[in-house]
Amino acid sequence: MFSLQDLCRKNIFFLPNDFSKHTLQWLGLYWKEHGSVHRAEKNSIVIQNELVLSINDALQLAGEEGDTDVVQLLLLWEGNLHYAIIGALKTEKYNLICEYHSQIQDWHVLLPLIQDPETFEKCHDLSLACDFICLLQHAVKYNMLSILVKYKEDLLNVRIRYRIQSLFVLACENRRIEIIDWIGQNLPIPEPDAIFSIAVATRDLELFSLGYKIIFDYMQRQGIFQLSNGVRMVVLNRHISMAIDNGLLPFVLETLKHGGNIHRALSYAVTHNRRKILDYLIRQKNIAPNTIERLLYLAVKNQSSRKTLNLLLSYINYKVKNVKKLVEHVVNEKSTLVLKILLEKKENLVDAVLTRLVKHSTYFQVREFIQEFSISPEKFIKIAVREKKNVLIEAISEDIWENPTERITYLKQIVHTIKYESGRRFLIDIIHSIYQSYSLKHEDILKLATFYVKYNAITHFKDLCKYLWLNRGTESKKLFLECLEIADEKEFPDIKSIVSEYINYLFTAGAITKEEIMQAYDALE
């Protein structure tokens, strides 16, 4: 409960000029050696109707003087007790501190308010449960470099040297630049690289740059700068990776400035899909087209985004010089997006990729690619014929045309379009294997026989004639006569000989007369 006097003092904002010193003392509104005191506003006071101070500044002054009465008055005016304690610590007025000691639950709370290192240390000493390391940690946290300087020799003591790393990290986390610089120059930091992780996480370029000063100055002092070039590059590459992963272009440029590898930076930008960083580096560093093409291979290998691929292709005008290498990566990594982008720019590498797929990939990969790019069966089969992939042709043609008769029909049409003899022979062999695997209708077998004659497929025709004779006998008379005419017209003597043999069988069986035979041969002349 407040007394009536306290209530009056708390709410007095104006003092009459004719109040005597005695009256002011009686009211408790007199500050020894300063004069009258009263509230001016909520957070300030007026001394002797002239000097205006904030309540907390006045509290610190009263604490320095050990004036408990004024402290009590200022607390009544909603001042912060911490400032009175700080003032008392500064001038070692421990009577005042003892009076209010019980009201301070945690002495660490006062530390951010203290500017003087000696007072700072005195305040921390009142935290009886804390140790020397706790003092150093708070010195770092609240930027009291002089305390660290004071205890430098203690920090170098082998018993607590291991604490240097945690103090360094704390300084970095609180961005105490002066302390970081001092630690770097005066103390052995076990893992100085921590500064870079913190700088990247907080996007603090100044801290990032300071890290290089600390590391390279240390190496210089130790005389190992040249000997550590390999280690240096490992560190720089790691920093490039961190910076690019977080999309921090200024950090990338800072690392390059300190010797980072531009090609490594470009590679990381590609693999991390950092298009803006990649674009900037290519333009500013005048990257050569062959290097950009290698980056394109890397982008394909890593399944990079459309934007990344488009950017790289745009720098080489969508013209790939080493098509073979690009195709190899597309096939190996099953990364076809680049083909679609090139198709949009009228650059077709689909056939080249299909050829490599047919050569080196599985049925499932080829089928997926054919479906993805809507490739015509004729195009695929011609490539597969050229590469002698009979099993692949049989499997995929079966997928396309489930009906064997339909399959043979379409394959026969493709044979007509193949210009070279070995290719036609290869595909005809496949057609014959399909015939051997299924039971075709009689009329389809007859069509196949005439097809064999037209392409001089001697062995297959002979095989078909044998089947027809054994299963249809004399019913094949018309076919043999037709085949005789075709063989003569195309000048295929071996086929003509086979047909003549079966015409003799027909004659022996009485299915054809001598006159009909003579008439057939006369028609050929």
Swiss-Prot record:
Tree of life domain: Viruses
Entry keywords, A to Z: ANK repeat, Repeat
Per-repeat ranges for ANK: 54-83, 129-158, 261-291, 324-351
Gene3D superfamilies: Ankyrin repeat-containing domain
Coiled-coil residue spans: none
A Pfam family hit: DUF249
InterPro entries: Ankyrin_rpt-contain_sf (IPR036770), MGF_505 (IPR004858)
Protein family: Belongs to the asfivirus MGF 505 family.
Summary of the function given for this chain in its UniProt record: Plays a role in virus cell tropism, and may be required for efficient virus replication in macrophages.
Protein name as it appears in the record: Protein MGF 505-6R
Species of origin: African swine fever virus (isolate Warthog/Namibia/Wart80/1980) (ASFV)
